[in-house]
Amino acid sequence: DTDEGERWLCPDGSGYYGRLYSERRSGFRLTVFCRDFETPAWFRRSVMYQIFPDRFAFSDDDTASRGIEYHKSLGQTPELHKSLDEPVRYWPREFETSYSPDDFYGGTLRGIESKLPYLKELGVTCLYLNPIVEARSNHRYDSSDYLKVDPILGTNEDFTHLCVTARGMGIRIMLDGVYSHTGADSVYFNLYGAYPDTGACQGTQSPYYSWYDFRHFPDDYRCWWGFKDLPEVNERNGAWQDFVVSGEDSVVKTWLRRGASGWRLDVADELPDDTLALIR
């Protein structure tokens, strides 16, 4: 509904944003599914609200600033904006040869929790959070530590408290699992030596070495869409599957125990079908 009457946003075959029309356009949808495919009962007919944690809500404490200092202690160069009015930085700084998405606005898990009454009033029954685990970037699709909330957002305990409070209001929490690749600056790959354990690129004796596909060790490795900061993993590797999916203390099971109700899988189309079945 607009001042000029109804407008319909419809796809136009370009693959981009589509076009606005003054009348409803005819179209079609082809949906193919297995009749016996089961989805969680709580998710059916749920009202989902997506949150990008860094930009949603803030807490009246020093969580974000302490998290920034933690990342600096790893040799990283994050920036914390003073207000939401400041523009997003999308260009390289003087000391960089390429853009690094590491400017933050300071949203936190406690900030999200403070907005739960508002979200409940909207009728939300499921919160889908973009990645919350420790990572170098503000989007956090370059996981550094799968088992730890990014300190800029808070703590693992903050996450559990958020889930408990949300569940009491009839709201479930869904997490974003990024499992086709890790960050190069991570516990697992450790390209810059920021973490104490031996990462895959630091030696073949690393417990994570078998996760990755090195064509020529240590500099030439398979990476997601050619981005060297996103080394791809072998999702059929037994050690990886045990750590992330099937082990008693796996990443998937740990976050469910902490209070998450389900997972959205990043680039699920790039994960092997048998790995998807294992996760389910």
Predicted regions and their residues:
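Substrate-binding/active-site clefts of carbohydrate-active enzymes
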Residues: 52-125, 132-258, 279
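Active-site regions of oxyanion-processing enzymes, predominantly non-cytosolic
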Residues: 48-51, 265
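The feature marks proteins involved in alpha-glucan
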Residues: 1-48, 58-83
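Short linear motifs at secondary-structure transitions and domain/linker junctions
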Residues: 22-29, 122, 207-210, 269
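Conserved beta-strand positions in the central sheet of alpha/beta enzyme cores
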Residues: 128, 174, 264-266
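Aromatic- and carboxylate-enriched substrate-binding clefts and catalytic-loop regions
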Residues: 268-274, 279-280
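Conserved, well-ordered alpha-helix/loop/beta-strand core segments that scaffold catalytic motifs
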Residues: 261-264, 270
